Amino acid sequence: MTGLGKRRPARSRSGVSGLRERRQPASVERSAGSEGRRELVIQGLAHDGRGVARDVDGKTVFVEGALPGERVQASVHRRRKRFDEAHVSEVIAASASRVAPPCRHYGSCGGCDLQHLSLEAQRDHKREVLRELLARQGIELPGASSLLADAGEGYRRRARIGVRVDSNGQVRLGFRARHSHRLVDLDDCPVLLPALSSLLRPLREQVESLEAPRHVGHLELLASDGAVTLVVRQLREHVADQRRWRAFAEAQGLHLGAWLGRESPRFEWLTPPPALHCRLTAGRRTLVLGLEPSDFLQANEAVNQRMVDTALSWLAPALSPVAPGTRVLDLFAGIGNFSLPLATQGAEVSAVEGSTAMVERLAGNAARNQVAVTARQADLNDAEACRRLLATTAPEVLVLDPPRSGAEALCRQLVEHPVPWVLYISCDPATLARDAAWLVSAGYVVRRSAVADMFAHTSHLESMLLLEHPDSARRQQGASTDG
């Protein structure tokens, strides 16, 4: 299931105990007969949610749909030099953590990969993934990671829906099948907000009614404060079909936009341009953040609020109301998800984004909420730009919320130019562990950790680390006392 907003590079799948899956040449065999079936005992769970076993020859086998402790009949569908890939054909002895999937499409739809595992066990697994990846870098957590979680269903407020028309003219609308570009036709999706899930069947009927359904590339859905926005990716403009889309949006009570054209698409509102926004709370304040359909917005509103609450709680000692004006540098700041709440606590916030349009949106959100945030643009993948930012802002607190590629350029700069406190919010624990290793090598100490279950029923996890540089913090305290 692909989200609406910031494009983040795809994660590579990872194994356990240091074994990481690598892309192999086409020396791959797809097995279908009984010679590809094996009885296996599952020893663990890989980071991507697959069971891990070893066959009679000691070769590692990754098994989709299998859980630790289970004995299964597995069908090998791909052989590689260092490991095989398989899927469960029969569960002989089931784990106590195995549950019935809440979605009837589970197993064919590729949007979720952990629905057969209880929600509690999913979250324990995600905590263990973070602990193990950090341990591989020699980093020990000070205690169990906090869990930031909410409902397991009906939580997702944005989604990209694929559209395909086959050679017989049949419309398929849904998400990609597992390991395939084929679409699984969906009438509902239990992880979507009900307001979005209920649109899947009407949307298919709408595409079927178009004169040129093959001109529809995909559909994007976004739920924001009491309204739903539909964005149509229209590969070729079609005036009659645009009229049909407007009528559909009016009947369903939707905001409607479209990306028009194939090579250099332009965005256009097909209904009156709305003032889209979402809300955050920061202490006693309610903040209203404006956004556009293409902006990055966390898919799970409730878990995002828990992450913001956690950031404010962890940083409270550094944001003492006795001494307001703590200098905070927020990098990859987006529309102000962390910048604005921190500013309400009296911090002097400088927020940085790579996109000029996003900087303007962030500045507008600060003005709308009457909080003092300085927004600026910089290339955060450029080491020299990162060095200049650290030098010119001299932050006491650094907040990082990078894409999946992480923030290695910046973390390398922090080795030479340490900041007393670093709050790192990550959507990929592997790049978080890599970057945290740079910081720990420079004297930083991990003080707090949390796992955010942003995408329940999937192996994806978000995490937070709070790191302190004790020497830098002491120097900062001394400077404040002298002042």
Swiss-Prot record:
Biased composition (Basic residues): 1-11
Active-site annotation: C427
Family annotation (InterPro entries): 23S_rRNA_MeTrfase_RlmD (IPR001566), MeTrfase_TrmA_AS (IPR030390), NA-bd_OB-fold (IPR012340), SAM-dependent_MTases_sf (IPR029063), TRAM_dom (IPR002792), U5_MeTrfase_fam (IPR010280)
Keywords assigned: 4Fe-4S, Iron, Iron-sulfur, Metal-binding, Methyltransferase, rRNA processing, S-adenosyl-L-methionine, Transferase
UniProt GO BP: rRNA base methylation
EC code(s) of this entry: 2.1.1.190
Family note: Belongs to the class I-like SAM-binding methyltransferase superfamily. RNA M5U methyltransferase family. RlmD subfamily.
Leading EC class: transferase
GO molecular function: 4 iron, 4 sulfur cluster binding; iron ion binding; RNA binding; rRNA (uridine-C5-)-methyltransferase activity
Entry protein name: 23S rRNA (uracil(1939)-C(5))-methyltransferase RlmD
